[in-house]
Amino acid sequence: MIPMKRVHFEYIQIHLASPERIRKWGERTLSNGEVVGEVTRSETINYRTLKPEMDGLFCERIFGPVKDWECHCGQYKRVRYNTDLKNDIVCERCGVEVTESGVRRHRMGHIKLAAPVTHVWYLKGIPSYISIILGLPRKEVEGIVYYNNYETTGSKEIARFIKDKQLLERKDRKIIDQSFFSLDEESELFSGAQAIQTMLSSLDLKTTAQNIREELAATEDWSEEEEDRLRKKRNKLIKRLKIINHFLATGAKPEWMILSILPVLPPDLRPMVQLDGGQFATSDLNDLYRRVINRNNRLSKLNTMLAPEIVVRSEKRMLQEAVDALIDNGKRGRQALVGSNKIPLKSLSDIIKGKQGRFRQNLLGKRVDYSGRSVIVVGPQLKLHQCGLPKEMAIELFQPFVIHNLINQGLANNIKAAKRKLQNNDPSIWEVLKQVIQGHPVLLNRAPTLHRLGIQAFEPILVEGRAIQLHPLVCPAFNADFDGDQMAVHIPLSLEAQTEARLLMLASSNLLSPATGQPIIAPSQDMILGCYYLTTENPKFQIERGHYFSTLKDAVMAYEQKRIHLHSYIWVRFQGRIDTKSTQEEPIEIRIEESGFCSTIYRRYQYRSFKNKKELKTAATPFYNSENAYLMMNKKKMSIPQKPSLESNNLSLTATATATATATATATATATATATATATATNANDHYFVQYVRTTPGRILFNQVIHECLELNEIHP
């Protein structure tokens, strides 16, 4: 095994590569002094011998042997001759280095292009860096690159550009030097990507940046009308200055956006596999590379033959299109190249971009141990910090912990016996699993993880089924919904990881967005609708009033028994302070009943007075209807209406004139008791006062939900 050299680095920087660096990637010198690396033939393998063709896309001399320690001709075969990298053996016949076949995964080659070509990302991308740095429209630059404006051998497009105002300085600029654009109609130097390369190489970045800064400084003296008219031009100058500053900061040169040497990927990254029927399945990159090599070789041959200019230009354009298809097939509306099955070929960009690309699929989305994946469904019964974990998944993820506990508790003698219990679904494993997951958080992640809240910690709750249950309020942080989304589960193994997950990553501790500081957990959609329905007032059920309850639980129980509606007005005995808008609120009604009960009724609450504790206990029955009690009163002793009203807009009193004075005194005593707002109080005459609040069963249920959320979501690690 070849020893691997460890390289420690702090960061990775991606920038333009120079032609020398690209050549260095794909070129190396063998121990016999031979320099290899250039791919000159488009053949892949010999279909008779099934061996790679020399100097082709799978050449063993360039990329390394197909089999370990075996050369192409077979002189060195199946023997590990030497492990010293300084004295590698090279076959005298075929020139293949005798080493491991794993080198074919990282050894690159290169293609020396017969004519420069532009990189399609920098030409047709948004923004087009080549057109911005040159200060020309993108369509004009493309016209030069693809020869769309050339009909004869004369360079009409170049002549037009020389006269164009965009290539002239304002006053003190001179016409472009002869070395920049030759006026010779017969010269092919100024057509295609070679013309763009000449323009970029002659560009002085520091001088251009200074000129742009001076021009931007002059715009500060513009009037408002001129500024509105020339704002678009100012924005272009700023954009051009930013790109030039990036080139100056990184040390890259603009002409490196033009390719003269094309790198070739290692063959194991674009494999060719033989099928059962004798046919071969190959990567689309091989077809794209083959097209580039064929056109490049044909162009080289035309140059040596001194072919007509129009033929050479046509071949250069075809080479440019072939390289464009290799880098990004179908970029910016171009018709994509298709294979034999009429399906567009996958280019280098298609391989690395998107959800199925190399970065997100293979580098960021690797499969790891102690992890699982399943569809998420809503779990409204869960707390904010909880998630429902399927039993089938939990027993697999926590298997080492379960086995350890089975042995420690004496339920299994060894690991083999513990695994047998797991395979047989022994009932004892579920109790052990509950003990294991108690206090052991799990991590839930939904790809793509675009910010810190894309992965959070939860306390697992064992559930039936095969779907992960999630609290609906944590969905905005994951950008998840319940239409088939999947989430991954990861198990923190060490105590340090578990502690960090509980302290820093628990869902109930991440309520604010790290980007904006605004709450990221807020009720929405059907939750808001449900809260509104619980707390709304329904006039249809306002006539169902007069029900008295001693506790909130009794009111909820009556609702569950369907004795009252969700929106029915009820009176509930309440211990606590009542806040009202007015400190001098007048009672709506004062009622004196035959039994001696005196009720002072306000809009949202009331007080009832009793002579002794016995009457107080009688009034504190779980379900008491004041209207039914009123019908049982002795109507002969008191002149009162047949059906008293709980609320009256004109503040009318339902007691007789004789009872009015007593009621007024009672109301005064009641108003004094309002400050304390206790459930039971006494006055100077030893009358007992009970406080009631008017509400609905829906509001009681709403308050219970809010209190449960506030109390149970407080996690103490």
UniProtKB/Swiss-Prot annotation:
Compartments, as annotated in UniProt: Plastid, Chloroplast
Q: Which InterPro entries match?
A: DNA-dir_RpoC_beta_prime, RNA_pol_asu, RNA_pol_N, RNA_pol_Rpb1_1, RNA_pol_Rpb1_3, RNA_pol_Rpb1_3_sf, RNA_pol_Rpb1_clamp_domain, RNApol_RpoC1
Can you name a GO cellular component term? DNA-directed RNA polymerase complex
Q: Which UniProt keywords apply?
A: Chloroplast, DNA-directed RNA polymerase, Magnesium, Metal-binding, Nucleotidyltransferase, Plastid, Transcription, Transferase, Zinc
Q: Which cofactor does it need?
A: Mg(2+); Zn(2+)
Question: In the UniProt record, does the keyword Plastid occur?
Answer: yes
EC number(s) per entry = 2.7.7.6
Name the positions where Mg(2+) binds.
D481, D483, D485
Q: Which HAMAP family match?
A: RNApol_bact_RpoC1
Q: To which protein family does this belong?
A: Belongs to the RNA polymerase beta' chain family. RpoC1 subfamily.
Question: What is the name listed in the Swiss-Prot or TrEMBL entry for this protein?
Answer: DNA-directed RNA polymerase subunit beta'
Native organism: Chlorokybus atmophyticus (Soil alga)
